[in-house]
Regions:
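A short, charged, amphipathic alpha-helix used as a generic interaction element across diverse proteins
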Residues: 44-62, 135-143
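A short, exposed loop/beta-hairpin motif centered on an aromatic-Gly-Thr core
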Residues: 34-48, 122-127
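Short N-terminal "domain-start" leader segments
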Residues: 1-23, 59-62, 83-101
């Protein structure tokens, strides 16, 4: 997968990404925080996977989209209080990491890197391109679910 970003004249940040599927290359683009649009491309004859990805993203790069260095990403943490005697609650919350990874990916905001539990809390770790937009989008996404009772969403200091 290749993820590209660009600041628009109106101040919004756009994303343009592509990844290899069984059918070819899936291209996905939009404004961060929104699902955007996508298009499936067939594999080009004579190109390997890297060449196909480069071909699909060529126009985006020509229009100023660039890969972000890892140092440009922020670590967002969603913290839950865990009932230590309720294994089902822990399983539901850990499954949240997979759901958030998909949500963050389809909205161009980033990815979820997993979760950790202990001392009565569960923390879900995400790498995002914009903490403010991602935290608001995540809060809205989980609001009416069994994972809407998070304690807080915060930015992990010292690792970004």
């Amino acid at each position: 997968m290749i993820k590209l970003y660009k600041r628009n004249p109106d101040g919004t940040q756009a994303y343009h990404e592509a990844w290899v599927t069984e059918q070819g290359v899936l291209e996905h683009w939009g404004v961060i925080g929104e699902v955007g649009e996508h298009q499936q491309h067939s594999f080009a004859t004579g190109l390997d996977e890297a060449g196909n990805l480069a071909s699909v993203l060529r126009k985006a790069r020509e229009n100023g989209f660039e890969e972000l260095p890892d140092s440009a990403l922020q670590t967002l943490v969603i913290e839950y209080e865990e009932a230590l005697d309720d294994p089902q609650q822990a399983e539901r919350r850990q499954a949240l990491a997979g759901d958030l990874d998909e949500f963050l990916g389809w909205t161009g905001l980033g990815c979820c890197e997993g979760s950790d539990d202990g001392a009565g809390t569960l923390e879900v770790f995400c790498r995002v391109v914009d903490f403010d937009i991602a935290s608001a989008a995540i809060a809205a996404e989980v609001e009416n679910t069994d994972c809407g009772d998070f304690r807080r969403i915060y930015q992990l200091a010292g690792v970004d």
